[in-house]
Amino acid sequence: MGVLENIVPGELYDANYDPDLLKIRKETKIKLHEYNTLSPADENKKSQVIRELLGSCTDNFIIEPPFYCDYGSNIYIGDNFYANHNLVILDGAKVVIGDNVFIAPNVGIYTAGHPIDVERRLQGLEYAMPVTIGDNVWIGGGVSIIPGVNIGKNSVIAAGSVVIRDIPENVVAAGNPCKVIRKITEKDSTTTNYRK
């Protein structure tokens, strides 16, 4: 997959018409179709198909179908990873996800972006920036993470957030655009009532 290695983070490349990239994406779609339509009872086959797709993973992870990505080979997931249904990862650049990360349904992790000016956008040009998610992060349902974002370890991203900037470690962040709401404190480890 040398053509993917030639993509320089933040620099424009031909994502829409490059025949090598189109071929890789088609092969990825075929594997994803197989993965997303396998019986839940066929755990061994599901594991084999997803492992062929990802850049790296451990033995201990779950990605609930349906799952979608552009290439798969730019996705690196840590140990004890769980992703609920409808995870979308546009992985023109690396997506590195740490250990013990939980992702709720309908989350989008996007490394791909397009030029603002219409001329270059219509030429099929785009750029890609890596996304990194630290250990022990929980990402709520419906979150969107844009190109180039880093989320620090132990943080929580509230449902529906749009993460456009880096989020530090050990915080709760929410909103559109996503902002730090508060630090995670010792009190959080003793809370038993989560009603509002």
UniProtKB/Swiss-Prot annotation:
SMART domains linked: Mac (SM01266)
InterPro entries per record: Hexapep, Hexapep_transf_CS, LacA-like, Mac_dom, Trimer_LpxA-like_sf
Protein species of origin: Saccharomyces cerevisiae (strain ATCC 204508 / S288c)
Protein known as: Putative acetyltransferase YJL218W
Record-stated family: Belongs to the transferase hexapeptide repeat family.
Quaternary structure annotation from Swiss-Prot or TrEMBL: Homodimer.
Alphabetic keyword roster: Acyltransferase, Repeat, Transferase
One Gene Ontology CC term in the entry: mitochondrion
